[in-house]
């Protein structure tokens, strides 16, 4: 196989959304699987809606997801001269023509066709008139009037369009700017793109683009159209389904590898395997396993998967990842070694970094700033519970050395010597140390806090 070149071509009229990100992931994986190239094009010809802030956001989102691209991004807004060269060639070769029909006249033609039960389209009035350029005139491609345009879609199989139903599409607008389909064809050809993966809302553009490739004598890439992502109600995914822009998922504490894994599984499968490393995805990815059916977005499954990735992240790496989220709540300067242990203690139940940062607060806060849950205090800090805490305080203070292992031994000995069950001492100790009934292993918590802070918290609980 010759070198595979894929592309991702977002429009900077908004932030990168999940559908676009999935397309980018599929295209990136296909290129990396074959050791090819993945190129990036910014389709910014809509001058009114395109904004630099969206371009920056898209590039940042791609980088965060780990989707590196080859070469520099190509910007359509800087290539108008190139597009016009190709349009002028089509005009010179008689494969395109000038048209003076107004939008109102074209709409009237379409209405007439509808009334006759025909495909609504431009009727070719200017096709053979030999007009020259002039104010208000557009350039149209001479599409074949008979036959079919057929291509083998990498996802959907063979797709055929009757040429009689295709328009003589506009390739240059009256203001001199190229249209979407013309620009895309010129770009993909000059960028060496061999495979185009995109959403199936582009299927109807494909025959038009194939006709342009053929008219220009350019090699036609392979096309694959993936079904859209649906919400739980089987409607097109939108914000009302809980979907966010990619940059928002970063800010809410998702790990990029979890989001990439989840997006890949929305439309691609490899047996029953759910979780993949990036290297596994590159090795196993194939367009043969892309689904023809639309996939449903499940935010709860995404959170579950992210939790799996959090638990597998080494504690020191996780500490670095969660630190920016702690900084937002005033805990950004925590000692690295302390934070590493704390992250390891709390990661088992966290689904995202925001949740992890919030859960860690009881061990990060100052001892005199620990917040107590009133119901937990009432339930656990009874006279009996306070008695156990007082006795345990004496035992902890008397230890020659103090760490998590020592704390565990003291607890075990106290329970055994007094004929107790752990549930008699666990809840009051947990409330004293963490302010609530839930949390990680108590011995590990005391090892993290150290003797001085453990005793300080026991003293504060005794004074409640």
UniProtKB/Swiss-Prot annotation:
Q: Where in the cell is it found?
A: Cytoplasm
Q: Which GO terms describe its cellular component?
A: cytosol
Q: Which organism is it from?
A: Oleidesulfovibrio alaskensis (strain ATCC BAA-1058 / DSM 17464 / G20)
- Coiled-coil residues: none
- What task does this protein carry out? Catalyzes the attachment of glutamate to tRNA(Glu) in a two-step reaction: glutamate is first activated by ATP to form Glu-AMP and then transferred to the acceptor end of tRNA(Glu).
Question: Binding residues for ATP, per the UniProt record?
Answer: 239
Is Zinc among the key words of this record? yes
Keyword Zinc attributed: yes
Name of the featured protein = Glutamate--tRNA ligase
Q: What is its EC number?
A: 6.1.1.17
Q: What is its main location?
A: cytoplasm
The record's Gene Ontology biological-process terms are: glutamyl-tRNA aminoacylation
Residues spanned by motif 'KMSKS' region: 236-240
Pfam families listed in its UniProt record: Anticodon_2, tRNA-synt_1c
- Cofactor requirements of the protein: Zn(2+)
Q: How is the cofactor bound?
A: Binds 1 zinc ion per subunit.
Recorded superkingdom: Bacteria
**Quaternary structure and partners:** Monomer.
Named from the GO MF annotations, one term is: ATP binding
Describe the reaction catalysed, as an equation.
tRNA(Glu) + L-glutamate + ATP = L-glutamyl-tRNA(Glu) + AMP + diphosphate
| Keyword tags | Aminoacyl-tRNA synthetase, ATP-binding, Cytoplasm, Ligase, Metal-binding, Nucleotide-binding, Protein biosynthesis, Zinc
- InterPro entries tied to this protein: aa-tRNA-synth_I_cd-bd, aa-tRNA-synth_I_codon-bd_sub2, aa-tRNA-synth_I_CS, aa_tRNA-synth_I_cd-bd_sf, Glu-tRNA-ligase_bac/mito, Glu-tRNA-synth_I_codon-bd_sub1, Glu/Gln-tRNA-synth, Glu/Gln-tRNA-synth_Ib_cat-dom
Gene3D superfamilies documented for this protein: 1.10.10.350, Glutamate-tRNA synthetase, class I, anticodon-binding domain 1, HUPs
- What is the enzyme's main class? ligase
């Amino acid at each position: 196989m010759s070198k595979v070149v894929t592309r991702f071509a977002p429009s900077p009229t908004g932030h990168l959304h999940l559908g676009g990100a999935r397309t980018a992931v599929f295209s990136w994986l296909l290129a990396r699987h074959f050791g090819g190239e993945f190129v990036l094009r910014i389709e910014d010809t809509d001058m009114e809606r395109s904004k630099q802030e969206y371009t920056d956001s898209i590039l940042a989102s791609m980088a965060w997801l780990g989707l590196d691209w080859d070469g520099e991004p190509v910007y359509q807004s800087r290539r108008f001269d190139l597009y016009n060269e190709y349009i002028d060639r089509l005009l010179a070769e008689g494969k395109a023509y000038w048209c003076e029909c107004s939008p109102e006249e074209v709409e009237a033609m379409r209405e007439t066709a509808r009334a006759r039960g025909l495909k609504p389209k431009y009727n070719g009035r200017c096709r053979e008139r030999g007009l020259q350029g002039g104010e208000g005139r557009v350039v149209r491609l001479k599409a074949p009037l008979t036959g079919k345009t057929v291509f083998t879609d990498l996802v959907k199989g063979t797709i055929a369009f009757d040429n009689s139903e295709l328009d003589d599409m506009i390739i240059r607008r009256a203001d001199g700017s190229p249209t979407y389909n013309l620009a895309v064809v010129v770009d993909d050809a000059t960028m060496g793109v061999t495979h185009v993966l995109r959403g199936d809302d582009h299927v109807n553009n494909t025959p038009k683009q194939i006709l342009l490739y053929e008219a220009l004598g350019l090699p036609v890439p392979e096309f694959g159209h993936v079904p859209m992502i649906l919400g739980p109600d089987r409607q097109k995914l939108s914000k009302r389904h809980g979907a966010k822009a990619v940059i928002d998922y970063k800010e809410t504490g998702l790990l990029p590898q979890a989001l990439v894994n989840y997006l890949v599984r929305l439309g691609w499968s490899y047996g029953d395997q759910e979780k993949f490393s990036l290297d596994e995805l590159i090795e196993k990815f194939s367009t043969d396993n892309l689904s023809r059916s639309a996939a449903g977005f499940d935010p709860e499954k995404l959170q579950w998967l992210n939790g799996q990735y959090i638990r597998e992240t080494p504690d020191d790496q996780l500490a670095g990842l969660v630190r920016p989220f702690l900084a937002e709540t005033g805990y950004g300067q925590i000692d690295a070694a302390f934070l590493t242990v704390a992250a390891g203690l709390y990661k088992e139940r966290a689904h995202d970094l925001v949740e992890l940062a919030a859960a860690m607060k009881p061990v990060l806060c100052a001892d005199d700033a620990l917040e107590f849950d009133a119901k937990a205090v009432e339930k656990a800090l009874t006279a009996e519970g306070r008695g156990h805490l007082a006795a345990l305080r004496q035992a902890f203070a008397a230890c020659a050395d103090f760490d998590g292992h020592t704390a565990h031994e003291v607890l075990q000995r106290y329970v055994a010597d007094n004929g107790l069950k752990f549930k008699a001492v666990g809840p009051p100790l947990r409330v004293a140390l963490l302010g609530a009934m839930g949390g990680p292993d108590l011995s590990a918590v005391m090892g993290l806090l150290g003797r001085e802070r453990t005793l300080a918290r026991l003293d504060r609980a005794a004074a409640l």
